[in-house]
Swiss-Prot record:
InterPro entries: NAD/GMP_synthase, NAD_synthase, NH(3)-dep_NAD(+)_synth, Rossmann-like_a/b/a_fold. Pathway: Cofactor biosynthesis; NAD(+) biosynthesis; NAD(+) from deamido-NAD(+) (ammonia route): step 1/1. The gene is nadE. CDD domains: NAD_synthase. This is NH(3)-dependent NAD(+) synthetase.
Amino acid sequence: MTLQEQIMKALHVQPVIDPKVEIRKRVDFLKDYVKKTGAKGFVLGISGGQDSTLAGRLAQLAVEEIRNEGGNVTFIAVRLPYKVQKDEDDAQLALQFIQADQSVAFDIASTVDAFSNQYENLLGESLTDFNKGNVKARIRMVTQYAIGGQKGLLVIGTDHAAEAVTGFFTKFGDGGADLLPLTGLTKRQGRALLQELGADERLYLKMPTADLLDEKPGQADETELGITYDQLDDYLEGKAVPADVAEKIEKRYTVSEHKRQVPASMFDDWWK
């Protein structure tokens, strides 16, 4: 088995999917998991990008079906901007599409800036823009877990195969969640699910961005990665890609393994 095949298997990627079937499977997963845990529903941060839009709509479909079956669950969508978000219009469009039971907005700027200032005062140096970006991601997850803990809700994560293979998420930030309904999907497969669900094409054709950096607001994921999502998707779907691209992907996969594992102990061997 080639490394490419090993990665596809580890990340549960299917080269070809039926969007209708995948939607049904993922809604059923959300329903089964929330029932099994006894939780009262879900909470998810909504950025206006493809991934949170898809996960949010799947979550809303799941809670509506459970209520129709006599259950009592809810879904809260959370906006978590740092000051004014450049693509706020897209976030509002996503919320309109998702139709969450409840939506709330937390501006994380005061919390992030207060921490950054205290860090500088105590340690005598400013956080790098990259590190501050990770603080933003972790404050967003703190907020979602506060809501979840207070109301008995599960935190949904938006990680999918194209992020997982590169480790392109913040450890214990957007990588922190209770369940991951998009696992195994490539970026283009996620787009296909949104198309099937009737989303505005603006929500899945827009340039993907983590938008965590003050110095480079709205920087494209592909710029930061040095790899395009089409290349990642081709690789994950078992297609041929240029040797240098495969090497980049496989190197990122190897060095980011710790992000896909629980914290290492001396009894684990995945890190050796």
